[in-house]
Amino acid sequence: MKNVNPTHTLAWKALEDHFAVMKDTEMKTLFSQDPSRFNTFSRTFSDQILVDFSKNRITQETLDKLQALAKECDVAGAIKSMFSGEKINCTEDRAVLHTALRNRSNTPVMVDGKDVMPEVNAVLHKMKVFSERVISGEWKGYTGKAITDVVNIGIGGSDLGPYMVTEALRPYKNHLTMHFVSNVDGTHIAETLKKCDPETTLFLIASKTFTTQETMTNAHSARDWFLSAAKESAFVAKHFVALSTNSAEVEKFGIDTANMFEFWDWVGGRYSLWSAIGLSIVLSIGYDNFEQLLSGAHAMDNHFRTTEAENNIPMILALIGIWYNNFFGTETEAILPYDQYMHRFAAYFQQGNMESNGKYIDRDGNKVSYQTGPIIWGEPGTNGQHAFYQLIHQGTKLIPCDFIAPAISHNPLSDHHAKLMSNFFAQTEALAFGKTREQVDAEFASAGKDPATMGYVAPFKVFEGNRPTNSILLKEITPYSLGALIAMYEHKIFVQGVIFNIFTFDQWGVELGKQLANRILPELKGKESVNSHDSSTNNLINRYKAWR
């Protein structure tokens, strides 16, 4: 990968000049000038996903200049480097190959001269065999009963991805009840175990190192709870499996290493749902549906890897994001799925984006002089409309939004879905085109109210519009289309990281807090006052000790 400061490129300078022209351009003008604007600024993936980016403050010239930026930053070269197994995660000296986990073509993928695909396929086969035994009831607990509940214990990428996908694909789930425990707060594991029976519960301990503090604290509490009923430590092997690479620690815990599902250091946590970390997904929806999830992602990988920039959906979305982040000065992006099953999608990509591109040091080790990753947030529609859309419509912040919805609902009750979708379509129209003072006055007149006497209210009913959105319409949320959608966002994040000239696949920002917590933990014992920190931290710790 080439290290290029984007602000030193000719394309960046051209974009700054172009922004001076575009900053006050209104979308309603762009639409009136081009009746076929939708056709120009939309793309369809595999007859499954329509991406409409026409409601953005862009012209073809904008996209051309953004694509010139991608070319100067050698995004195409970076894509080749990632897919070919080069160690592009330089600070950890690792390849970045979550794409190999879903490589349905089985073409060789080389890391250090070795094809990783045989190992990938072996773990997938192991997941298939194990999941079929559990789902069928062949796998028995210590009293001979079949498993009814599965508890995934992990944190970060070992939790967010599997939880998001199992929720998004609930229409495909089987009889097993899934639970996810992540927080080291004892409430999380305690409340989960209240719903479970030790005779019929299977625990998945998801930790690459098997030393993650939060995960292992919860795992030991789960084991204690289990043994309080089962008594015999030998029974742990029937109720606990490991998603890990540390066989020594797994064995010490009491898990049979035959029930350890491996993954590799070239799989980043926030990109790991495609690996053994996805075992909870397989147990929830079955292996065939998991394969469809992989296939959808693989299809998007192929699109991303082989499609020219002007038709490359992740590339287009990434460049539009940079346009707002680095030229309009927006600080956040909202992800707004109009599908209740997708209620964890924004949280998943909050980690996916912010942990990947929340960096202020570039690939040369220098502090950047430009904005990098945006703040990501969002909630399902229509709930958000009655919560925070007020600020999106009439606030002083410009917030680009992704609206996501399926054309076909898994629950076609009465006219629920039509009402949901009418809101989906209405919101992007309202954000783009707004409502003028003239329209407000006309509404007063048609309601028999005198606009002159109602004038004091009128300013509050005006919507400026010109708020940018992408509309992402799926035919239906299936394992295949969800896989493609997730991969689309993953590659968008990657492209932005390349252009920002940062390392997208490490996460050193999580380390300092963990180190300090390990130092503070022993200080919380006993009653003696603590004075080894700053005055704020000392007094917070001492008040905690006094009150507990």
Swiss-Prot record:
The keyword Isomerase applies. SUPFAM superfamilies: SIS domain. One of its GO terms (molecular function) is carbohydrate derivative binding. Keywords: Cytoplasm, Gluconeogenesis, Glycolysis, Isomerase. Its EC number is 5.3.1.9. It is found in: Cytoplasm. Pathway: Carbohydrate biosynthesis; gluconeogenesis; Carbohydrate degradation; glycolysis; D-glyceraldehyde 3-phosphate and glycerone phosphate from D-glucose: step 2/4. Its main location: cytoplasm. GO terms for biological process: gluconeogenesis; glucose 6-phosphate metabolic process; glycolytic process. The active site is at residues 355, 386, 514. It holds the Pfam family PGI. One of its GO terms (cellular component) is cytosol. It catalyses: alpha-D-glucose 6-phosphate = beta-D-fructose 6-phosphate. Belongs to the GPI family. Catalyzes the reversible isomerization of glucose-6-phosphate to fructose-6-phosphate. This is Glucose-6-phosphate isomerase. It comes from Proteus mirabilis (strain HI4320). The lineage of its organism: Bacteria, Pseudomonadati, Pseudomonadota, Gammaproteobacteria, Enterobacterales.
